[in-house]
Structures are given as C-alpha cells and as structure tokens.
C-alpha cells in the first residue's frame, strides 16, 4: 500500500505525487471521500489516475491510497439477473444501502451479495487430483443456469476437503493440497483482473450459426457462435432494437448486455421488457440468463472504458464453464469517446479525429476475447463468446476511425441504412452493403445438418436483390413498363423478398422471432414462385396474367410471416399451391 497526495485535478483525471511504490493499473482510493480510481500512467513518482466517479470537490493536498490490486471483478453465484454499473457495483443493492436514486460517491459495496446462501452440490470427492478449470461442484443459480464452481487458475493438487450444503460466496467449501504442500482454501467466488483475458486450452474455428430469429441476419449475414459482428448506423436506424432482439432470442445460454454511454431509457426498456419475455429455448423468463451492465450517458465517462472489460470478463467466466455466451456492447463509439477524452487529458499525441493512436489495438483487444474455445481442465468441454458491438458514427459516416478499426477485426458487418429506416423498413440492414465472412461455413454446416440445399437458395435470393438494384436506375429513367417481361418478374420477386421476407416487426408477438425451419419454408415459397413464373414466361405466358392469376397465393405468402411456428405445415403447403396456380394460368391460355 502506497500513500500519495493529489497535485492536480482535471475532470476524471487526477495526478498524485509520492507514488513511487505504486504500479500501473493499481486501484486507488482518491481523496477524503475514497473515490475509486485506476493508475493509467506513471512518470517518476507521479501517477495519473483515471477516476471512475465524479471528481467535483476533490482538490490538491488530499490523500491517494493504492490497494496494490488491479481493477478486478468478482465471479461467482449471484451474477445472473443482476444489474451492475461499469465497475461492477450492484445498482439495486447500492440504491437500498444509500437510500438514494443517485450514485453516492465513495460508497464501497461488494459486487456479490455476502449474505445470500447458495446450495452447493459437489461433483468430485476427497482424494481426487484436480487442475485449474476442473468443475468441483454446481450451484443452481436460476431455473435455467447451473453455476459450475471451477478450480481457479494456477491452482492444482489433491482435493483434501469438499463440503455439501448452503454457503455464502465467502465461505470455504473446498481445500486443495498443492504440490508445494500448501493448502488452498477455496470458496464459491473467485476474482479476475478485467484487462487480462482468461486463459484457455485451445482456440477453435467457429462453425455453428448463432440463430437470432431475425430473417435478414440468419439468411444473408449470419454470425457464428464465437464470432464477432458490428452494427454501425446513424441515429434512429435501429441499432438498439437489433441488439435487443438478439439479446432476447439468440440460441445462447447466457446474454451479457452492456449499455455503454447510451441513453438510460434504453436500459429501462430492457428492465421492463426482459422479465416478461419467455425464452423460446427454455420456456423461462429471459432475465434468468441475462447479466446487465449499465453505464449510461449521465454516469462518469471514465467508467465507460471499464464497463466493456467488465462485461467481457464475466462472459469469459461463463464460457469457461462450457456455456455459449453472447455479449452486446451498445455502443463501442461511446467507449472510444471515453478513451479520446482520457487521452486528451493525458496530453498524448492524437490520431485520426482526435482519437488516440492506440484506438485500433484497444478495439482489437476487446473483439479478440470472443471465440470458440476448448476450456482449461481435465474434463473436455467447449465454450463460446459471440461479441456484437453497436457503432454510432456521427452522421452515419462509416469512414470515421471507430467504424473502420472495428471493420478490420470483425467478420460480420450489419450496415444499418438511414433511407431504409425512413421508409419504415426494419431491421434497416442494407443487403447490398452488409456482409458476413461466415456465410460459406454456416451454409455448409446447415446443408450438412438439415440435409437441405440452403446455401443455394440464399445465393439465388441475393442474386435477385442484386439484379433489382442494377435495374432500378433504368426504371427511374424510363419506367417499369419499358423492362422485359423477365426483368419485370425479377422486380416483383425482389419486392416480395424485401417486403414479405426481410421486413420484420419487432413488436409483433409472432413476427418478432422466426425459427430456422420457418425461414426456409418462407424463402422456398418465394423462390418457387420465381422459378415457376420464369418457366411460364418462357412458355409464352404474359407477366400481367401470371400476377393476376397468382394474386391470392402471393397474398398468402406475404401473410405467412404472421403464421405461428406450430402451424408451419400451412407455410410449406403454399409451395404446391404456387405451382398449381401458375399451371392454371397456363391452362387458361394466359399466352
């Protein structure tokens, strides 16, 4: 422990002298109030401290005391369904302890409840050899999540004691005799520094798709479990709704939602909606698998930087248990702005648009902690972290540094488009500018698993949309009637794909989520219409006759998005109906 004195205060940056025994990344208690801060720069005996609380009223001469520990999170039972701030203070218990709706400064509250008792069930017995990552036992944390208590990193040896029963997170529940003869006493909780990634046995190639229930994502721009995706877009384009939809319906075990510098009412929406929503995979409330980290725009700027690391560290902990985790960061632009502010106050050389020169490496550090891994431990298990980051470029300009540095790292780009949003086409993901580098892997995985020709259907549908884009210029100049019959059909089918398939209502109880079998059935119907109508045109039928003769079935295809999942056979039955009606047009002599 080292004690120094404040010499200058500049917003969230405090400079203290007499800190020669301190280290970079040490946590400090700043001033008489004991505000939480982290050392981010050392120059001789002077330390620059990033303070995670409001610094007004703090002045030169006040003491600074280091703890000798880096910024760490507590990992154990009690994380799920909880809401933390950027440095893992539990907001509901904070409010009860301080009897205030605001964050009172200098209040220290443990992240995990020290009074709550958890029923621990051992999985190993005394005398067994254990290594780091082995699962010692389980705690049923929620109806959905079984919390697996693991041997901490760098601990191994012989299990000499393990107890069943109800314990708090600080009670000793097991003892391990290590190779040097010392006894390690372990509890249900462990701590981990947030800026250090948790070790794994092996990184694996992600191949299994993350099913989100959003048709434009799952069909054209899929992300894998263990992948990384970016959602850039201007204000009002629907970034937050896309993130909420994925958090609600993604086929993962755990969701960690980090509200980083965005509006407080967006976190309020999450708190209001999530407890009422039922997870289609488990039948339980979605809050039973969710951890919320709220660091809204009216909270201290410096804590935004910590909130992203806090979220990804909690995600790594659940990944190490063998779970698939999705982490949503909304938005990484606000996090980058916090980096820019601290860099400016440190008087560092600025890079593009005032952001620090190390912006790219910091963004890479975050996204590279995602992935599919084989975890530590003698038991074989895999875990995944899927990282999805919203980016809010000013004015929707994706050439700005945060977006460009993000695109260098992630493999999926869901580009939200202001003109689409203005036309009320949601999700406003532009199918011409977005991309997914996982498309081939996911397509072959689905073809193999479902024994279907999915990747071919996706390619055909995208080709129709691209053909429509190339014809639009001609239509604007000389009108739709000047096109050939085949091109008019292409325009009609493209409109069907856009309006009846890609457009999706997040606030409709049925349309908000579409399972993969339903997506395939809907797309098959549209492509069957295109194929059969093309054949009819080649046999001499007129385009207008085909459209009039199939008006009823096309209307049913358009309404199929509102057919519940349990009535899937109704959608599949439309394929034969399409063929039948087009043959009927030919038989009537629509030539």
Swiss-Prot record:
GO CC aspect terms: proton-transporting ATP synthase complex
NCBIfam families: PRK04192.1
Organismal lineage: Bacteria, Bacillati, Bacillota, Bacilli, Lactobacillales
UniProt family annotation: Belongs to the ATPase alpha/beta chains family.
UniProt keywords, alphabetically: ATP synthesis, ATP-binding, Hydrogen ion transport, Ion transport, Nucleotide-binding, Translocase, Transport
Keyword Ion transport belongs to the record: yes
Domain of life: Bacteria
Catalytically driven reaction(s): ATP + H2O + 4 H(+)(in) = ADP + phosphate + 5 H(+)(out)
Function: Produces ATP from ADP in the presence of a proton gradient across the membrane. The V-type alpha chain is a catalytic subunit.
Protein name: V-type ATP synthase alpha chain
InterPro entries referenced in this protein's UniProt entry, alphabetically: ATP-synt_VA_C, ATP-synth_a_Xtn, ATP_synth_asu-like_sf, ATPase_a/bsu_AS, ATPase_F1/V1/A1_a/bsu_N, ATPase_F1/V1/A1_a/bsu_N_sf, ATPase_F1/V1/A1_a/bsu_nucl-bd, ATPase_F1/V1_b/a_C
Claim: Cell cycle is one of the keywords in the record: no
Binding site for ATP: 233-240
SUPFAM superfamilies for the chain: C-terminal domain of alpha and beta subunits of F1 ATP synthase, N-terminal domain of alpha and beta subunits of F1 ATP synthase, P-loop containing nucleoside triphosphate hydrolases
PANTHER family attached to this UniProt entry: H(+)-TRANSPORTING TWO-SECTOR ATPASE, V-TYPE PROTON ATPASE CATALYTIC SUBUNIT A
GO-annotated biological processes: proton motive force-driven plasma membrane ATP synthesis
EC number(s) from the headed UniProt entry: 7.1.2.2
Recorded GO MF terms: ATP binding; proton-transporting ATP synthase activity, rotational mechanism; proton-transporting ATPase activity, rotational mechanism
